């Protein structure tokens, strides 16, 4: 027997079946998938880090020789 696994859409919270029946998983639809992508592109979402890359001593506009 196989159990039906369900998750909540991260955008709208709707229940989504985790399987081939849901091609946009974990999202419920292409719309929710694109909303999430837009939030990442607009930098509304980010992965936390311990330091800011722009303040790093290793960051430079010029390539090292």
Curated annotation (Swiss-Prot):
Coiled coil: none annotated. One of its GO terms (molecular function) is zinc ion binding. GO terms for biological process: regulation of DNA-templated transcription. Zn(2+) binds at residues 9, 12, 28, 32. Gene3D superfamilies: Erythroid Transcription Factor GATA-1, subunit A. Interacts with GyrB. Inhibits all the catalytic activities of DNA gyrase by preventing its interaction with DNA. Acts by binding directly to the C-terminal domain of GyrB, which probably disrupts DNA binding by the gyrase. Belongs to the DNA gyrase inhibitor YacG family. This is DNA gyrase inhibitor YacG. It comes from Escherichia coli O6:H1 (strain CFT073 / ATCC 700928 / UPEC).
């Amino acid at each position: 027997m196989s159990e039906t696994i369900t998750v909540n859409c991260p955008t709208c919270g709707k229940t989504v079946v985790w399987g081939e029946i849901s091609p946009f998983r974990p999202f419920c639809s292409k719309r929710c998938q694109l909303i999430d992508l837009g939030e990442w592109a607009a930098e509304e979402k980010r992965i936390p880090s311990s330091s800011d890359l722009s303040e790093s001593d290793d960051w430079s506009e010029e390539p090292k020789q």
